[in-house]
């Protein structure tokens, strides 16, 4: 049984309409502790021209053993617009996730609520899938932070106008932090704990690292 999602809106919308969709749906995001995690999924997209190649992986949360993998591809015409990444990558990611078993928590290479409208890719896709989700981005989109201490596990809060929206998390000692934020049905402490547990010797958590490698390999095969 693959992961299923709810079609809450059209993907064929103008950027201004996409912004309004984000504003409308952001109020549906829920925050809660993520407990009893046995499996974790990650998804990433690589491009070959206008063709998007997505990989979704399902891993054992405890030993990061690969349990399932699925691929999807489609032509993408939606432009790259910061803050509207889901409208470019979301459809192909959802198609890839349909091919793997349901995970207890989902990791996305993007923002959760660390977003101008508190509705980044992890929040958006988590809401559509109705599953706990976490954003773990390699770069900051929104909010201010101070550099965390150099040790693995150190973090500093990501703050926007007095509101905590995420954290800069050091997943490897003396390596640049990643930017973690709750997506949907998660909270910041869970997001930090899960992202750190999934980072096994690399800066990027293993589900996202593996999904990136596999999607990039697929994209290169078509060039």
Curated annotation (Swiss-Prot):
Which principal EC class is assigned to this enzyme? hydrolase
Keywords from the named record: Cytoplasm, DNA damage, DNA repair, Endonuclease, Hydrolase, Magnesium, Metal-binding, Nuclease
The cross-references to Pfam families, in alphabetical order and at most eight, read: Endonuclease_5
| Highest taxon above the source species | Archaea
Subcellular localization: Cytoplasm
Q: What is its EC number?
A: 3.1.21.7
Q: Where is this site: Interaction with target DNA?
A: 80
One BP annotation, GO: DNA repair
GO MF annotation terms: deoxyribonuclease V activity; magnesium ion binding; RNA endonuclease activity, producing 5'-phosphomonoesters; single-stranded RNA binding
- Which reaction(s) does the protein catalyse, per the Swiss-Prot or TrEMBL entry? Endonucleolytic cleavage at apurinic or apyrimidinic sites to products with a 5'-phosphate
Where along the sequence do coiled-coil regions lie?
Answer: none
The cofactors required by this protein are: Mg(2+)
- Binding residues for Mg(2+), per the UniProt record? 44, 109
Which family does the record assign?
Belongs to the endonuclease V family.
Described function = DNA repair enzyme involved in the repair of deaminated bases. Selectively cleaves double-stranded DNA at the second phosphodiester bond 3' to a deoxyinosine leaving behind the intact lesion on the nicked DNA.
| HAMAP family reported for this sequence | Endonuclease_5
Question: What is the protein's given name?
Answer: Endonuclease V
**Which organism is this entry from?**
Methanothrix thermoacetophila (strain DSM 6194 / JCM 14653 / NBRC 101360 / PT) (Methanosaeta thermophila)
UniProt lists the gene as nfi
